[in-house]
């Protein structure tokens, strides 16, 4: 279902609150790797929609525990017998082709769906808002969800992180709106039928999957062009080989554009003009200005440039320098009102990159017609996302913070955010994620690690990842020392880490536990226990 004129006042409420996946046989749906952050969200949505769900995972974790409490049967360990009763078997790109359950499913002619396939089924007859990007997509999706929750927009939400407001990574809503974080690592975002496509940022991560940086940019371009409407950073530069991440200006103005992909954009963002278009219309800008970082929140003003548009003649009427393009009926005249939303407070946020995330969320809200009061309330009540610059503990005025960053640009953004709230030392407890990523960005990692005051390296995640010559943590340590950075150690013991922190920190210092793996998260909590005697 493609809805072009879609605002809050004309939301179509589903006659049935349950998902209706006619393409999938009724029966047991078995999810391989059900404890993963994305797969667990799918499992819960299906379960809450009265589908019979079971699954398996190599080991138990918090997601597995949560799903088991809901009554979902989960096998620990993979075994061909696990899928005997299943009609449908779901897997993700993380599951190898020789997985015993996947092999058994093929041999027994089970219906097999990739994660993107089951998502496509879930999204049938939904108005889909898909948030993708190299970084920032989880936080942006969570901010949109918070605005929805405070504007009576009862959307279904599927996100790749634990939202603190839900203590969960999914929610089954009653409206036809579905908000989803769209994974770019395996091109899942290209299989999602998005009505609104949101890009948060683009960098050269996942080069092993895509082959070249141009392929990454082309994939995001396809993502935009497949949607009815696109929201993306002003300087995302899909066709720019030099820099494609969000660029923050020097004057404190952070633009985000709202752009309908059937026109040529004002900025070179790789959106091709569709055949139905007969002229170029510039995009609307949504900007943040007068930005103030507080202790655990950011306050700013939102500037919205708009114009009136007569789609019957494809000629902008009384447009400002940057103009809005909304998907309307062929004869309708509308306007995106130029205005300022003063004193927006984004709670539980530190760092200018969070402002960009908020602007993307605000842009979605504007597109859907959510009023300014509800937008402000949703961001004020934003509770954050687990492991996204999350405070683990504050011990003797030394803050222990964990963050999911694992790409060099993400680690640098996390470090910059920490520098913005302290003049003290910053210690990085860093768990590199995958040897291939270390190989691809070795020099960048070295450059950024040298920006810390101290670095403690922990073993590469995941532990089963095949080592690459020259990319071990010993090699990282050696490279740092050879470049004159001697404040680096290798540790994998919370007691040793806690002793080091106690001996090396003073009031006002910050310790960052950085990485996407479970080991660094475990170390963060165990370190707190050793330092404070309090379990968390």
Swiss-Prot record:
ATP binds at residues 133-139. Pfam families: Mur_ligase (PF01225), Mur_ligase_C (PF02875), Mur_ligase_M (PF08245). The keyword Nucleotide-binding applies. The keyword Ion transport does not apply. One of its GO terms (biological process) is cell wall organization. It is found in: Cytoplasm. It is an enzyme of class 6 (ligase). InterPro entries: Mur-like_cat_sf, Mur_ligase_C, Mur_ligase_C_dom_sf, Mur_ligase_cen, Mur_ligase_N, MurCDEF_pg_biosynth, UDP-N-AcMur_Ala_ligase_MurC. It catalyses: UDP-N-acetyl-alpha-D-muramate + L-alanine + ATP = UDP-N-acetyl-alpha-D-muramoyl-L-alanine + ADP + phosphate + H(+). One of its GO terms (molecular function) is UDP-N-acetylmuramate-L-alanine ligase activity. Keywords: ATP-binding, Cell cycle, Cell division, Cell shape, Cell wall biogenesis/degradation, Cytoplasm, Ligase, Nucleotide-binding, Peptidoglycan synthesis. Pathway: Cell wall biogenesis; peptidoglycan biosynthesis. Its EC number is 6.3.2.8. Gene3D superfamilies: Mur ligase, C-terminal domain (3.90.190.20), Mur-like, catalytic domain (3.40.1190.10), NAD(P)-binding Rossmann-like Domain (3.40.50.720). GO terms for cellular component: cytoplasm. HAMAP family: MurC. Belongs to the MurCDEF family. Cell wall formation. This is UDP-N-acetylmuramate--L-alanine ligase. It comes from Wolbachia sp. subsp. Brugia malayi (strain TRS).
């Amino acid at each position: 279902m493609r809805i072009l004129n879609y605002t809050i006042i004309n939301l179509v409420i589903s006659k049935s609150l349950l998902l209706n996946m006619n393409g999938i046989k009724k029966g047991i749906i078995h999810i391989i790797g059900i404890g993963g952050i994305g797969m667990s969200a799918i499992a819960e949505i299906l379960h809450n929609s009265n589908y019979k769900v079971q699954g398996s995972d190599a080991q138990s974790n918090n997601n597995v525990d949560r799903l088991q409490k809901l009554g979902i049967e989960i096998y620990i360990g993979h075994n061909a017998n696990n899928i005997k009763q299943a009609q449908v078997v779901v897997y993700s790109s993380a599951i190898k082709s020789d997985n015993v359950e996947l092999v058994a499913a093929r041999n027994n002619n089970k219906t097999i769906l990739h994660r993107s396939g089951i998502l496509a089924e879930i999204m049938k007859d939904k108005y889909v808002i898909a948030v993708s990007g190299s970084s920032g997509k989880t936080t942006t999706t969570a901010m949109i969800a918070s605005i929805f929750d405070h504007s009576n927009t009862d959307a279904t939400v599927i996100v790749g992180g634990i939202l603190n407001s839900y203590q969960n990574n999914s929610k089954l809503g009653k409206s036809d709106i579905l908000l989803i974080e769209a994974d770019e690592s395996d091109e899942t975002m290209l299989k999602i039928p998005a009505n609104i496509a949101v890009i948060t940022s683009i960098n050269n991560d996942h080069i092993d999957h895509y082959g070249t940086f141009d392929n990454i940019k082309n994939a995001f371009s396809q993502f935009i062009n497949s949607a009815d409407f696109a929201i993306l950073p002003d300087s995302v530069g899909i066709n720019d080989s030099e820099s494609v991440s969000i660029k923050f200006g020097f004057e404190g103005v952070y633009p985000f554009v709202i752009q309908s992909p059937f026109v040529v954009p004002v900025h070179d963002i790789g959106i091709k003009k569709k055949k139905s278009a007969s002229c170029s219309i510039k995009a609307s800008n949504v900007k943040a200005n007068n930005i103030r970082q507080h202790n655990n929140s950011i306050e700013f003003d939102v500037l919205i440039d708009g114009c009136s548009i007569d789609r019957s003649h494809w000629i902008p009427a009384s447009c400002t320098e940057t103009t809005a393009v909304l998907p309307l009926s062929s004869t309708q005249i509308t306007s995106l009102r130029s205005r300022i939303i003063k004193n927006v407070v984004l709670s539980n946020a530190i760092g200018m990159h969070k402002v960009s995330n908020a602007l993307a969320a605000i842009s979605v809200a504007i597109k859907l017609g959510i009023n300014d009061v509800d937008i402000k309330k949703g961001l004020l009540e934003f509770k954050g996302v687990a492991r996204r610059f999350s405070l683990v503990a504050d011990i003797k005025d030394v803050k222990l913070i964990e963050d999911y960053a694992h790409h060099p640009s993400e680690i640098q953004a996390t470090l910059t955010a920490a520098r913005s709230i302290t003049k003290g030392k910053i210690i990085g407890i860093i768990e590199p994620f995958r040897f291939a990523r270390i190989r691809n960005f070795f020099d960048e990692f070295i450059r950024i690690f040298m920006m810390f005051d101290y670095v403690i390296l922990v073993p590469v995640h995941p532990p089963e990842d095949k080592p690459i010559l020259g990319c071990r943590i010993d090699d990282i340590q050696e490279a740092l020392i050879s470049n004159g950075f001697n404040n680096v150690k290798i540790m994998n013991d919370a007691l040793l880490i806690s002793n080091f922190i106690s001996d090396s920190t003073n009031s006002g210092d910050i310790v960052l536990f950085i990485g996407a793996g479970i080991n660094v998260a475990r170390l963060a909590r165990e370190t707190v226990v050793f330092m404070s005697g309090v379990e968390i």
